[in-house]
C-alpha cells in the first residue's frame, strides 16, 4: 500500500524562519521547491496473537525533491539571445569551448590546472551576459589585487567590454560607491567589498545576473564568498555563478561543501592527464629527491630520544599515548590527545592537568624532531633553545611546578645537545641538513646553462628555514645567483627573554629608593637594548642578505612585497625563497624551476606550488624529501587522484539552478574575432598589476576621455537602503497582529475571531488651545478608556450643548420617534427646528432675567430657526455688541428660542434620542438626509469652530455666552458679583499665577517649576471631573449658573493680539506642561 503526500515550500534561508515571510519572495526569488514523500509499507514482526511489536516501523518514506524556476525577472535583449559570442583572438581550445557553453546555462565549478585559461573562460561568459541583459550587474571577485588585475586585462584586452562601463572596487573608501554601482555594469572587486556594499544597501542584490568567483576552494566556513552568495540568494535566485579553481578541496566532503555554498550544478574538472588538455600543457619534469639525514642530525635525534623515553613510557602506561619509538613521536597526535583530556569533565582536576602536561611535553618534543629531520640543526636549535630557556627560567623562580618537564629539561643529555648545537651554528660554513647541499647543487647546475631571464622559486613552510636558505645560497658567492626572501606581513615571533622575565618577577622592594633604583635600571636596560638593536640593524645592512634578515624579523609590507616582485621580474633577484604566501594569489611571473624544500599532506598546497612553473615555457620541479615525507607526498597525491575520480563519477549532490535564458531559446555559437579599441588594448602591454588597477580606476572615473570631465556636485551621501522582498510590510508590526485568535465550539471546531477595529478621531489641524477647546465638549463616554466594559463602542455618543450646560445632574430628554434616527457616536451634526411661534418677548421671559442668557436648570430647550437660513451658517458670524441680549437690538430674521420647563431623566437609553415632534433638516450643504439616516459623518475633519453643535446652537451660544475672544482655563472660577457677564469675569489669583508661569517658560525660570506642577495637577482634576478644594463654588446658585471650567465654551470671531499674548507665545511649553506626567 502506498501513501503519497506532496509538500510545496519555498527554499529555506538561514535567517528567515517564518514560512509566511518566505512566501513573500515569489516574484524575485523564483525558485520553487516541491517535496514529494512516498510511504512504502514494510513487513512487521508480530507476536503469537498477531499484534505488532512495539518499535516496529510500519513504513519507510521515500522523499523526492524537485526544483523548478519561474521566468527570470531580469530584462533581456531578445535580439541577442539567439547567439553567443566566442572570441577567436586566441587559439580555440576544445576544453575551453565546452566549459564556456555549459557555464552560460548552469552554475559551473571550473577546476582545471593552473595556467590553462580560466581567466579566458570567465571573460567570455561575462561578455555574453553583458550582451544578453539590460541594466544588470556582472561581478568578478578575487581574494587578491593581482588576480583582480589579471581578470581586468582579460576582459578589456580580450573580450572588448567597453572600458567606460566597468568599475574596479578594491579600496576601503566608500566615496561615490552608490553612484558607481548604479551607473556601471561590470565590476571587479574583492568579495569583502561586495559583501559590505550589499549589506549597507549600496548594491541591489536583485540586479546581479552573473557572479564570477576566483580561488573558489576558499568558499568554505564563513569566508566572504559564502556570506556573499547567501545574501544574494535571499533576494535573487535567478543569477549565474561561475567558480574558478585549480583544486576544489582535499576531500569529497570539502567539495560537497563548496558545491552547497555556491549553488553549483556541474563541476568541469580537468587534470594534467586529461585528453583534451594534455596537448596544451607545457612539459614539466618532476623529480623526487630523497635526502638522507646527516650523521650530526642522527646523533642529536638519538640523544633527544634517550631524554624523552621516561616520559613516553609514563604516557603509554597511563593510556595517554600509543607505544612507539621515541624518534617517531608525532606532535599532532599528542596535541589531539591533550585536547581530549581537557574536554573530559569526568577526570579529576589534579589528574587532568598532570596528564595534560605529559602530553604537552611530548608535543614539544615532536616539533623538535620534525624540525630536526626536515629543516636541519639551525631551525631545530632556534626552537629548542627558546623552549629550554623559557621553562628553566620559570621553574627556577617557582613560577612552574611541572616536575615531569623538569625531569626532561634538567637532564644532562640536553646540556650536551645545547653545547653541540652551539658549536655547529657558530660555524658559518656548516650546513645543518643534507637538503641544503642539494639546493646548492641544483642551483649551480641550473644557472650554468640557463639564460639571464631564468627564474627559480624555493618553497618552504617556516620563516627560519627561509632565512637559512637565503644565507646558504648567498654563501655560494656566485654572482649569477641572487636570492631574496619573500614572506608575509606579520612580524616574526620574538624569542623568550629570560633576563626581562626575571626582572619582572623579582622582588621589587617597598621603599621609595628601591622604586627609584628599579626605574633607573629599567631605563638603562631599555636604552642598552635599543642601542644593541640599532647596531644589529646597521650590521645587517652591510651584508647582502641584510634586507632578507630584516624582513624575517619585522615582516614584509605590501610595498616591500611589490618591490621584491618587481625586482624579481626585472632580474635583480633570480632566486626567490617563499613561504606559503607565494603559492597563490600573486603574479610572480614566469618561473623555470621550482624547488620544494619541504612537502605537506595537503594536495592543494602541493599543486599550487607546482603550478607556478610550466605556464608559457617548460619547467622543472624538484621535490626534496626526507624522513617520512616521501610517503606523505604520495598519499596526498593518491587521495587527490581518488577525489578526481569520485567527482567524475557524479558522487556529489548538485543543485538545480535557473537557466535564466527562456527554455524555448537555444543560442548558437558565433565565433568572431573581436576588435579591441585602442584604450582597451592598452592594458595588454602592462605587466605590473598596480598599473592595470590604476588604468582601470581612471577608466571608471572617466579620466581616459579627452574631453574635460564635468565636476560632479558633492551633495549629501545617499541614505542607506534596506532591500526587502516584494510585498513585505515594512515598519514595526505589533505582536498582536502576528497572532491569530480562535474560538472553539462545543464540538472542538476552531474558527477565527474577527479583529475589532476601534474608531479614532480624525487628526485635527488645530493648535494646542483649539484641541483643549474640543476636550471641553467631550463627555466621559467619548473616550473608550472611560467607558464601561459592557458598553459597545458604537453606543458612545458626543454631548450637545444642552448636555454641557446641564451637566451636573440631569440631561436632555426627548420623546422617542420611530421616524427620527438616533445619533451615533460619529453622527453628523444636525439642526433641530421648532415651530416659528416663539417671539422675542417669550424668549426674554424664558431667560429668567439672569444676565447671562443661560437657561435655568430643568428647562426643556427648543429652537426656532428661520426657514431662509443659508449655507453660510456653517461659518461664524461677525462679533456682536455687548448688549446683544437686548431683544430690541436684534435684527429681523434672527432665530428665536423657546424654553419650556420639563423634568429630566438620566436613563442611558434615552439621553440622546431626537424628539418625535422635531423635524430634522440639514442646514449644512454637505449634511444630507442620507447622512442623518445612515449615521455617517458628512466630513472627515472638523475645524476650530465645528464640533458637535448645530448651527442654531452655535449662534445662540455666540450671541449670549461668548463675547470674549480666547479660551479661558478656569480650574476654580471666582466671580466678584453674582449677575456678571462671562466677558468680564476676571482671572483668579491662582489662574493668574498659572499664566505667569507660562510666560516665565521663555526665560527658563526654575523657581516656577514646583508651582507649575501643582497647577497642572489641579487643572487635570478639574477637567476630569475630580473633586476640588472648594466644591461648593461649583454648585448652582439662585442668581445664576456656574458650571465647571470644562463646560465653559468661549469663542472669538476676531482675535485680539493684546489678549493673553504672553500666554500664547509658548505653545510648545504649554503642550509639555499639560502632557507631562
Curated annotation (Swiss-Prot):
One annotated GO biological process: double-strand break repair via synthesis-dependent strand annealing
One GO CC term on file: nucleus
Residues that coordinate or bind ATP: 112-119
Catalyzed chemical reaction(s): ATP + H2O = ADP + phosphate + H(+)
Residue numbers covered by motif DEAH box: 214-217
The EC number(s) this enzyme carries: 3.6.4.12
InterPro entries according to UniProt: DEAD/DEAH_box_helicase_dom, FANCM/Mph1-like_ID, FANCM_DEXDc, Helicase_ATP-bd, Helicase_C-like, P-loop_NTPase
Keyword Protein transport assigned: no
Entry's Gene Ontology molecular function annotations: 3'-5' DNA helicase activity; ATP binding; ATP hydrolysis activity; DNA/RNA helicase activity; flap-structured DNA binding; four-way junction DNA binding; four-way junction helicase activity
Bias type Polar residues, positions: 831-841
Gene3D superfamilies, alphabetized: P-loop containing nucleotide triphosphate hydrolases
Sequence segments annotated as region (Disordered): 536-556, 831-859
PROSITE patterns in UniProt: HELICASE_ATP_BIND_1 (PS51192), HELICASE_CTER (PS51194)
Keyword DNA-binding: yes
Localization per Swiss-Prot or TrEMBL: Nucleus
All copies of domain Helicase C-terminal, residue ranges: 511-660
Keywords: ATP-binding, DNA damage, DNA repair, DNA-binding, Helicase, Hydrolase, Nucleotide-binding, Nucleus
Residue span, Helicase ATP-binding domain: 99-266
Similarity-based family: Belongs to the DEAD box helicase family. DEAH subfamily. FANCM sub-subfamily.
Subunit structure: Interacts with the MHF histone-fold complex to form the FANCM-MHF complex.
Protein purpose: ATP-dependent DNA helicase involved in DNA damage repair by homologous recombination and in genome maintenance. Capable of unwinding D-loops. Plays a role in limiting crossover recombinants during mitotic DNA double-strand break (DSB) repair. Component of a FANCM-MHF complex which promotes gene conversion at blocked replication forks, probably by reversal of the stalled fork.
Listed name of the protein: ATP-dependent DNA helicase MPH1
Native organism: Eremothecium gossypii (strain ATCC 10895 / CBS 109.51 / FGSC 9923 / NRRL Y-1056) (Yeast)
Amino acid at each position: 500500500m502506498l501513501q503519497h503526500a506532496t509538500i510545496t515550500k519555498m527554499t529555506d534561508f538561514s535567517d528567515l524562519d517564518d514560512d509566511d515571510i518566505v512566501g513573500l519572495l515569489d516574484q524575485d526569488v523564483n525558485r520553487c521547491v516541491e517535496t514529494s514523500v512516498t510511504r512504502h509499507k514494510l513487513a512487521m514482526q508480530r507476536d503469537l496473537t498477531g499484534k505488532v511489536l512495539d518499535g516496529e516501523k510500519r513504513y519507510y518514506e521515500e522523499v523526492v525533491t524537485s526544483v523548478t524556476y519561474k521566468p527570470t525577472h531580469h530584462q533581456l535583449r531578445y535580439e541577442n539571445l539567439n547567439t553567443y559570442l566566442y572570441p577567436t583572438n586566441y587559439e580555440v581550445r576544445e576544453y575551453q569551448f565546452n566549459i564556456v557553453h555549459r557555464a552560460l546555462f548552469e552554475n559551473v565549478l571550473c577546476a582545471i590546472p593552473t595556467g590553462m585559461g580560466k581567466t579566458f573562460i570567465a571573460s567570455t561568459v561575462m561578455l555574453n551576459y553583458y550582451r544578453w541583459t539590460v541594466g544588470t550587474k556582472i561581478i568578478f571577485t578575487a581574494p587578491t589585487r593581482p588576480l583582480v588585475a589579471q581578470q581586468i586585462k582579460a576582459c578589456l584586452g580580450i573580450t572588448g567590454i567597453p572600458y567606460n562601463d566597468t568599475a574596479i572596487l578594491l579600496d576601503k573608501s566608500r566615496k561615490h560607491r552608490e553612484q558607481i554601482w548604479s551607473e556601471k555594469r561590470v565590476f571587479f572587486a574583492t568579495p569583502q567589498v561586495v559583501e559590505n556594499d550589499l549589506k549597507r544597501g549600496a548594491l541591489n542584490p536583485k540586479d546581479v545576473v552573473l557572479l564570477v568567483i576566483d580561488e573558489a576552494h576558499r568558499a568554505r566556513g564563513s569566508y566572504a564568498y559564502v556570506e556573499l552568495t547567501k545574501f544574494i540568494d535571499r533576494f535573487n535566485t535567478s543569477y549565474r555563478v561561475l567558480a574558478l579553481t585549480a583544486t576544489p578541496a582535499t576531500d569529497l566532503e570539502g567539495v560537497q561543501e563548496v558545491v552547497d555554498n555556491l549553488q553549483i550544478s556541474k563541476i568541469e574538472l580537468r587534470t594534467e592527464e586529461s585528453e583534451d588538455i594534455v596537448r596544451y600543457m607545457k612539459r614539466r619534469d618532476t623529480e623526487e629527491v630523497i635526502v638522507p639525514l646527516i650523521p650530526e642530525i642522527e646523533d642529536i635525534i638519538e640523544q633527544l630520544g634517550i631524554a624523552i623515553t621516561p616520559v613516553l613510557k609514563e604516557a603509554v602506561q597511563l593510556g595517554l599515548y600509543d607505544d612507539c619509538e621515541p624518534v617517531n613521536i608525532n606532535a599532532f597526535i599528542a596535541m589531539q590527545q591533550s585536547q581530549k583530556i581537557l574536554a573530559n569533565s569526568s577526570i579529576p582536576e589534579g589528574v587532568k592537568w598532570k596528564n595534560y602536561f605529559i602530553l604537552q611535553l611530548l608535543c614539544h618534543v615532536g616539533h623538535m624532531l620534525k624540525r630536526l629531520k626536515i629543516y636541519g640543526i639551525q631551525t631545530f636549535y632556534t626552537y629548542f633553545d627558546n623552549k629550554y630557556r623559557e621553562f628553566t627560567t620559570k621553574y627556577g623562580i617557582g613560577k612552574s611546578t611541572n616536575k615531569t618537564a623538569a625531569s626532561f629539561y634538567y637532564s644532562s643529555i640536553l646540556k650536551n645537545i645545547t653545547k653541540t648545537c652551539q658549536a655547529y651554528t657558530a660555524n658559518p660554513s656548516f650546513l645543518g641538513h643534507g637538503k641544503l647541499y642539494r639546493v646548492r647543487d641544483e642551483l649551480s647546475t641550473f644557472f650554468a646553462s640557463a639564460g639571464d631571464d631564468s627564474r627559480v622559486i624555493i618553497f618552504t613552510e617556516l620563516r627560519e628555514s627561509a632565512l637559512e636558505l637565503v644565507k646558504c645560497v648567498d654563501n655560494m658567492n656566485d654572482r649569477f645567483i641572487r636570492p631574496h626572501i619573500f614572506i608575509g606581513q606579520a612580524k616574526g615571533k620574538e624569542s623568550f627573554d629570560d633576563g626581562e622575565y626575571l626582572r619582572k618577577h623579582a622582588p621589587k622592594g617597598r621603599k621609595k629608593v628601591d622604586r627609584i633604583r628599579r626605574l633607573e635600571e629599567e631605563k638603562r636596560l631599555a636604552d642598552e637594548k635599543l642601542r644593541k638593536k640599532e647596531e644589529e640593524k646597521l650590521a645587517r645592512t652591510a651584508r647582502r642578505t641584510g634586507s632578507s634578515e630584516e624582513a624575517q624579523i619585522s615582516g614584509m609590507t605590501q610595498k616591500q612585497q611589490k618591490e621584491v616582485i618587481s625586482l624579481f621580474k626585472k632580474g635583480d633577484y633570480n632566486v626567490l625563497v617563499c613561504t606559503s604566501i607565494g603559492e597563490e594569489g600573486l603574479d610572480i611571473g614566469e618561473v623555470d624551476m621550482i624547488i620544494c624544500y619541504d612537502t605537506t599532506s595537503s594536495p592543494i598546497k602541493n599543486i599550487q606550488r607546482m603550478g607556478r612553473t610550466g605556464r608559457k615555457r617548460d619547467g622543472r620541479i624538484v621535490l626534496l624529501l626526507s624522513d617520512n615525507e616521501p610517503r606523505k607526498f604520495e598519499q596526498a597525491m593518491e587521495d587527490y587522484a581518488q577525489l578526481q575520480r569520485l567527482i567524475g563519477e557524479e558522487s556529489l549532490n548538485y543543485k538545480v539552478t535557473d537557466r535564466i535564458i527562456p527554455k524555448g531559446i537555444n543560442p548558437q555559437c558565433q565565433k568572431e574575432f573581436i576588435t579591441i579599441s585602442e584604450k582597451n588594448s592598452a592594458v595588454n602591454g602592462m605587466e605590473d598589476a598596480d598599473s592595470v588597477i590604476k588604468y582601470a580606476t581612471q577608466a571608471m572615473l572617466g579620466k581616459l576621455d579627452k574631453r574635460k570631465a564635468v565636476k560632479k556636485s558633492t551633495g549629501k551621501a545617499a541614505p542607506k537602503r534596506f532591500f526587502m522582498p516584494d510585498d513585505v510590510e515594512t515598519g514595526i508590526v505589533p505582536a498582536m497582529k502576528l497572532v491569530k485568535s480562535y474560538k472553539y465550539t462545543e464540538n472542538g471546531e476552531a474558527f477565527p475571531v474577527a479583529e475589532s477595529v476601534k474608531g479614532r478621531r480624525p487628526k485635527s489641524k488645530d493648535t494646542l488651545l483649539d484641541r483643549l477647546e474640543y476636550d471641553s465638549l467631550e463627555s466621559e463616554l467619548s473616550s473608550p478608556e472611560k467607558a464601561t466594559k459592557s458598553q459597545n463602542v458604537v453606543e458612545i455618543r458626543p454631548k450637545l450643548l444642552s448636555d454641557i450646560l446641564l451637566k451636573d445632574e440631569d440631561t436632555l430628554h426627548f420623546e422617542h420617534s420611530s421616524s427620527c434616527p438616533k445619533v451615533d457616536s460619529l453622527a453628523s451634526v444636525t439642526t433641530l427646528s421648532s415651530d416659528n411661534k416663539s417671539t422675542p418677548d417669550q424668549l426674554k421671559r424664558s431667560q429668567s432675567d439672569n444676565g447671562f442668557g443661560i437657561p435655568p436648570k430643568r428647562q426643556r430647550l427648543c429652537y426656532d430657526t428661520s426657514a431662509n437660513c443659508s449655507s453660510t451658517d456653517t461659518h461664524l458670524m461677525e462679533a456682536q455688541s455687548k448688549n446683544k441680549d437686548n431683544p430690541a437690538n436684534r435684527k429681523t430674521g434672527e432665530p428665536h428660542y423657546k424654553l419650556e420647563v420639563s423634568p429630566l431623566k438620566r436613563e442611558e437609553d434615552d439621553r440622546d434620542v431626537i424628539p418625535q415632534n422635531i423635524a430634522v433638516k440639514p442646514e449644512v450643504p454637505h449634511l444630507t438626509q442620507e447622512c442623518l439616516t445612515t449615521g455617517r459623518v458628512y466630513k472627515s475633519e472638523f475645524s476650530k469652530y465645528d464640533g458637535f453643535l448645530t448651527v442654531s446652537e452655535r449662534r445662540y451660544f455666540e450671541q449670549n455666552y461668548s463675547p470674549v475672544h480666547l479660551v479661558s482655563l478656569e480650574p476654580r472660577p471666582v466671580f466678584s458679583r453674582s449677575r456678571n457677564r462671562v466677558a468680564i469675569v476676571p482671572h483668579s489669583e491662582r489662574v493668574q499665577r498659572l499664566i505667569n508661569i507660562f510666560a516665565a517658560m521663555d526665560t527658563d525660570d526654575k523657581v516656577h517649576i514646583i508651582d507649575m506642577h501643582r497647577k497642572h495637577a489641579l487643572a487635570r482634576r478639574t477637567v476630569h471631573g475630580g473633586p476640588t478644594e472648594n466644591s461648593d463654588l461649583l454648585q448652582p446658585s439662585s442668581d445664576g449658573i456656574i458650571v465647571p471650567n470644562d463646560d465653559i465654551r468661549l469663542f472669538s470671531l476676531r482675535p485680539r493680539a493684546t489678549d493673553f499674548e504672553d500666554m500664547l507665545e509658548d505653545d510648545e511649553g504649554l503642550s509639555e506642561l499639560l502632557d507631562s506626567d
